[in-house]
C-alpha cells in the first residue's frame, strides 16, 4: 500500500491530467472485454471474523487484487490504487463459499481508470446459482518506473451495459472531484479564519 499523501498527490496528478487536453499522440482504445477478469477463491477458517463469517477486509483485498489485475492489463503496465468508492457488502460470506470477484474497466481518463467490481459467492452447501454479495468501484492511476502518471488507452464500451457503466463512472468522477474541491475550499476558509487543523 502506498503512503496516503503520495496516493493523494498521484490521484490529483492523474485527475488533472485526465481533465487537461493531451498533446501526446493518441493511444488506440481497448474494448472492455480485453481486460475483464474473474478471480475465484475458496473461503477458509483463516478468513473469518469474530462472528464466524468472512472478514470484510479479506473481501476488500480480493476486490483490490482483481481490480489491480484489470487496471494493469488495460493500461499495459503498473497501476496503483488511488481510491475505493462505494464498497458495499450485501450478504455475508461463509467458510466454504467459492467467491468469484469479477472486474472490468468502466471508464478511463488520461492516466486514471475506474474499475467496477462485483463479488459473487457460490454456497458450498447449496446447489443454487451464485449470489451477489458485494460490489465496489476503484480508481487506479497508471504509473511509469518513476511513479509518475502515464497515459492509458481509452476504454471502448461494447454493450449497452458497458455504456451505462461508463456514464455512471463519469458521474462518480464528477462527484469525487466536486467533493474534493468542497473540502479544500472549507479547509482554506478555516485557515483564513485562523483555525488550526
Please provide the spans of the model-predicted regions.
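Small beta-barrel nucleic-acid-binding modules, principally OB-folds
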Residues: 76-92
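Active-site helix/loop of acyl-thioester processing domains in fatty-acid/polyketide metabolism
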Residues: 58-76
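Extended boundary segments
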Residues: 32, 36-53
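HotDog/MaoC-like acyl-thioester-processing domains
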Residues: 2, 6-21, 26-27, 34, ...
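N-terminal leader/targeting segments and the first structural element of proteins
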Residues: 40, 44, 73-74, 88
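A conserved, well-ordered hydrophobic junction motif at loop->secondary-structure transitions
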Residues: 48-62, 195-197
